[in-house]
Regions:
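Ankyrin-repeat boundary/"N-cap" motif
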Residues: 22-32, 53-66, 88-98, 122-134, ...
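Solenoidal tandem-repeat scaffolds enriched in leucines and small polar residues
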Residues: 137-266, 271-274
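Bacterial Sec-dependent N-terminal signal peptides
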Residues: 1-26, 480-481, 487
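N-terminal leader/linker segments that initiate helical-solenoid repeat arrays
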Residues: 18-83, 88-91, 473-474, 487
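Ankyrin repeat A-helix N-terminal signature
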Residues: 34-35, 64-71, 99-105, 132-140, ...
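Ankyrin repeat domain, specifically the short helix-to-loop turn at the C-terminus of the second helix
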Residues: 45-50, 76-85, 110-118, 145-154, ...
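Eukaryotic tandem repeat interaction scaffolds
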Residues: 240-271, 275-426
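Leucine-rich solenoid repeat scaffolds
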Residues: 452, 457-487
Length: 487
């Protein structure tokens, strides 16, 4: 049984709602935005809301209160509660002082340190508190002074890519003043990351032309990856054609490829909607068909996430609509998984292969059922079926869609799949039926009852001679359910 269970865990993608926690108001950001009083917090806590519980993303009350600028006295009260120790690990391995630094909350940072918060912690992405603050755009020199006092090192504290605080904060700078400050604390205009990228490349991500001009005046070199960095932009701010033309005017190479095999259009194609920008780069010889080290092209990225207008525009330049990335995913697969029905329909209209399979043997139907809960599902299904999609083909490891839906514990999906003539008793590579998988993984007997109602055989055994009843008996999620009907 244990062997089978491990196989299942390694082969199936489970929907997080399967293990969904009971709703906790302390995990709702709007609750903290209202700056609730301690009295209100106590009332909510008395009603069963857990003040120290981490949610599925490892955020808790203290983190959300910090992120939403709740009064510091309230946050201090939360910290006094059992389970909210100052060095508690939260999302991405960050303790509370990381989030205080992220919000430029120096008062809270000092309070946490007074309560023995550690300042030498490195998060799951390789960031110290200093570098996390810099990478999120913090420019308060008083906070940096304090972190230096707490033994942070401006010169040598680096992330996994070898970038120090000067490089990490560069994209967010409005002027040269913080650069001067960091230089006075030990940084250098010659500082580079592990790939030889310096402050000019990092500043190019932010697209501040005035700052870039100042750096040029200071004699800073314009690295070969500058246009790549500029094309990436920031999460909430993307660069414009003006920035790209400026960089070209000062000698930055436009048609460049980085160590990951990407050109500037790889990043731009995800969400830039300015046709003039695409025309500019294409006119400079930047290739929309270039596949990076993971096999993805700018066109694939557009099909994954951009508008129909951009996809149509770039499609005029592609050489093979059915090119695949290293995981065997075509532009059509990506559009089914992540884009809208109009892009799916367009790609099919220009020759995208309806029978495409990824490297694991999954067809388009696999990607379609993974968006079952979205409003796009039925529309995409209709388009794909009209173009010849067969829904009862086997997927990876000889799984049917019923196997996958059972592993996801998704009764609604199982019912929707019933019309596609899928053999409910088919066995996958591990010689398991959908019912056997459900018996091991479901949290409700309703799925078991449904599978039996559509013809699933219950008098079958695993390779370890275990019956359906045996499997369900070992399922902790069913320990309070009556499963005698499986005998």
């Amino acid at each position: 049984m244990k062997k089978i269970h491990i196989v299942l865990l390694s082969n199936f993608i489970f929907i997080s709602s399967m293990f969904a926690q009971k709703a906790n108001i302390f995990h709702e950001r709007n609750f903290w935005k209202a700056n609730p009083s301690i009295k209100v917090i106590d009332e909510k806590s008395s009603k069963g809301n857990n003040i120290s519980e981490l949610n599925n993303n490892a955020f808790d009350a203290v983190v959300y209160a910090t992120l939403e600028n709740t009064d510091n006295n309230t946050i201090k009260y939360l910290l006094s509660k059992e389970g909210n120790s100052v060095n508690k690990k939260t999302h991405d391995g960050r303790t509370y002082i990381f989030w205080a630094a992220y919000k430029n909350n120096l008062e809270l940072m000092k309070y946490l340190v007074s309560k023995d918060a550690k300042t030498n912690i490195v998060d799951d992405h390789g960031y110290t508190i200093l570098n996390f603050a810099a990478s999120t755009g913090q420019t308060n020199t008083k906070m940096y002074d304090y972190l230096i006092k707490m033994a942070a090192n401006i010169k040598t504290d680096k992330n996994r890519k070898g970038a120090n605080v000067l490089l990490l904060v560069a994209p967010y700078l409005e002027n040269y003043s913080l650069v001067s400050y960091l230089l006075s604390k030990g940084a250098s205009l010659e500082d580079k990351d592990n790939n030889g990228n310096g402050i000019f490349e990092y500043a190019a991500k932010g697209g501040n032309i005035s700052l870039l001009e100042t750096l040029i005046d200071k004699g800073v070199q314009k690295g070969e990856n500058t246009m790549i960095f500029a094309s990436q932009g920031l999460r909430r701010k993307k660069n414009t054609l003006q920035t790209y033309k400026f960089l070209e005017s000062v000698g930055v190479k436009t048609n460049c490829i980085d160590k990951d095999g990407k050109n500037p259009l790889h990043a731009i194609a995800y969400n830039n909607k300015d046709l003039a920008t695409y025309s500019y780069f294409i006119s400079k010889g930047v290739n929309v068909n270039l596949q990076d080290n993971k096999g993805r092209s700018p066109f694939m990225n557009a099909a994954n996430n951009n508008t129909l207008e951009i996809v149509k525009f770039l499609s005029k330049k592609i050489t093979n609509i059915n090119s695949k990335d290293k995981k065997g995913r075509s532009a059509l697969i990506m559009s089914v998984q992540s884009n809208n029905k109009d892009v799916v329909k367009f790609l099919l209209g220009i020759g995208a292969n309806i029978n495409t399979e990824d490297a694991d043997g999954n067809t388009l139907s696999y990607y379609l059922i993974n968006i079952f809960k979205t409003t796009e599902f039925e529309d995409k299904l209709s388009i794909l079926e009209k173009n010849g999609l067969v829904m009862n083909k086997l997927q990876y490891s000889k799984n049917t869609l019923l196997h996958i839906a059972a592993a996801q514990d998704n009764l609604a999906l199982l019912k929707r799949l019933n019309s596609f003539n899928i053999d409910v008793n088919a066995e996958n590579k591990d010689q398991l039926s959908a019912l056997q998988i459900a018996a091991m993984e479901t949290k409700s007997i309703k799925i078991l009852e449904y599978l039996l109602s559509i013809g699933a055989h219950k008098n079958i055994k695993t390779a370890f001679n275990e019956t359906i009843y045996d499997l369900a008996s070992e399922n902790e999620l069913l320990k309070n359910s009556n499963i005698n009907f499986l005998k």
